């Protein structure tokens, strides 16, 4: 199937006028195609820009500092680890009362390794070893209550639960009289 070029004579005279006279170089069909291509390009780039990292970071391992304490030990320390955090695509129904709720996915651990540290200053009879998770990879999935705290964030996730260790400073380092925690070799 061949296409025929559109000539200026085929376009109505009122569309070919420029400041009251006929433009002999009028190219409306090509300009319209250029505008469509430009619009398509801008729309496709807009979708790309909206999904870039700074705007909505996806579920992935990130560095985090967590407070570690153990009942019976007089110390609360912080450890650097990786946790799973970020956005997962979710949907909700407009008519929630009529239709059942959709399952919501959250950022979960996919592969995890556990590391252990020895808390300093624990009295005899209290095991000083504490283990914590290190996220190797993450995934968006239903919340597994067996391995994940599905509730909202704690008011102060980097603080210790024991009121003796809660103070106005953000430092959770062990007291200077106690040695630093020692890392134990992984399994």
From Swiss-Prot:
GO terms for biological process: G protein-coupled receptor signaling pathway. It is found in: Secreted. Glycans are attached at residues 63, 80. Keywords: Disulfide bond, Glycoprotein, Hormone, Secreted, Signal. Expressed in placenta, testis and pituitary. Residues 173-187 have a biased composition (Pro residues). Pfam families: Cys_knot. Coiled coil: none annotated. One of its GO terms (cellular component) is cytoplasm. Disulfide bonds join 59-107, 73-122, 76-160, 84-138, 88-140, 143-150. CDD domains: GHB_like (cd00069). Residues 1-50 form the signal peptide. InterPro entries: Cystine-knot_cytokine (IPR029034), Glyco_hormone_CN (IPR006208), Gonadotropin_bsu (IPR001545), Gonadotropin_bsu_CS (IPR018245). It comes from the Eukaryota. Residues 161-187 are annotated as: Disordered. One of its GO terms (molecular function) is hormone activity. The keyword Signal applies. Encoded by a cluster of genes that have evolved by duplication from LHB. HCG-beta is encoded by six non-allelic genes (CGB) clustered on chromosome 19q13.3 and named CGB1, CGB2, CGB3, CGB5, CGB7 and CGB8. Two specific hCGb proteins that differ by three amino acids in positions 2,4 and 117 have been described: type 1 (CGB7) and type 2 (CGB3, CGB5, CGB8). The CGB gene first arose in the common ancestor of the anthropoid primates. This is Choriogonadotropin subunit beta variant 1. It comes from Homo sapiens. The gene is CGB1.
